[in-house]
């Protein structure tokens, strides 16, 4: 039997992978250590989340802060996590404020560590489902999982007590349980989806998206558009029993809306549903920015140029539609202008609100929309039904929200990255973590007067 000697490229890829992992972990540890010393008080909305969780840790499950808009999943998780630590360390539950209770719920950093563990330990393991299903033999996938968890929109919340990390983990897990057609667990997927609703109500849209992917994966033969739609409908009917979990989620959500009188649990006056269509373009532009290493090449630019030249009338119509949306469906929420502790404040003030920049912004929206769709097509992991379902899910999730808030784009960003090609993983790792390094420095060293 001949001796097979791995090529130098394989060795370099493996070494690069583990060097990147070590660098990333060191960066995360340093960042968390700095956060624990720097943030002596709750950060922005943390004051509501930490206070509510600490109320639960006093076994008071009846009090609810009306400023909180999301369900109590984060606080239940924090309570269970704290109780587990108490059992393991035999520590007391007494404490108060950020400084009390060394290893309990009353230490803000203990609660923050939930998201750190979730993002750095649990999420990569969940992502392995997608990696194993698609890319076993691809040397280009060595950085795949670490680049997903390095996404700056998500990375920020590893060090704060917010709902975003847990919400994202559960949606990705639910999707992973049905994504690989040889190993599908729809009822378990629906159960995990139900759990995600306890962290963010809009996850009901992503549960519907996951159900559509489950059905689409049942279609084994590639067909034309009309025939695939027909097969999709037929598979939905013949697999109705496997869809029951998702259907139950939707029914329960409708009941919740009826009983609650709306989608948010509190602060209803500041969270009214409005048509904020431009929010989709904000999201697509963010995604395009964070995935620059995947598309910045001559081939992509040439493809975009040819699309414009070969479809001039179509692109003029699209441009007019985008302009109309910018002029008529852009909402400036009072929170956006009132709080200069968010990047969104500066993006709007210095870019989006400047009239002379509108033509350039329109072009950015046009290109990012083109790039999102073409990348999903090129990725080859989703049929046109899957791509259409993704676009609909993004729209239904974002358009009703009047607030420009980049963290709302985390789930669309992560799911997008699951279904596209990543040809330059090392470059992508450097790009993403350079952004993380810059934003971390600003967070820790640039004081903001509010």
Curated annotation (Swiss-Prot):
Keywords: Endoplasmic reticulum, Glycoprotein, Glycosyltransferase, Membrane, Transferase, Transmembrane, Transmembrane helix. The lineage of its organism: Eukaryota, Fungi, Dikarya, Ascomycota, Saccharomycotina. The chain crosses the membrane at residues 12-32, 158-178, 190-210, 243-263, 273-293, 312-332, 357-377, 384-404, 429-449. Pathway: Protein modification; protein glycosylation. The keyword Ribosomal protein does not apply. It comes from Candida albicans (strain SC5314 / ATCC MYA-2876) (Yeast). It is a multi-pass membrane protein. Glycans are attached at residues 34, 297. GO terms for biological process: dolichol-linked oligosaccharide biosynthetic process; protein N-linked glycosylation. This is Dol-P-Glc:Glc(2)Man(9)GlcNAc(2)-PP-Dol alpha-1,2-glucosyltransferase. One of its GO terms (cellular component) is endoplasmic reticulum membrane. Belongs to the ALG10 glucosyltransferase family. It is found in: Endoplasmic reticulum membrane. Its EC number is 2.4.1.256.
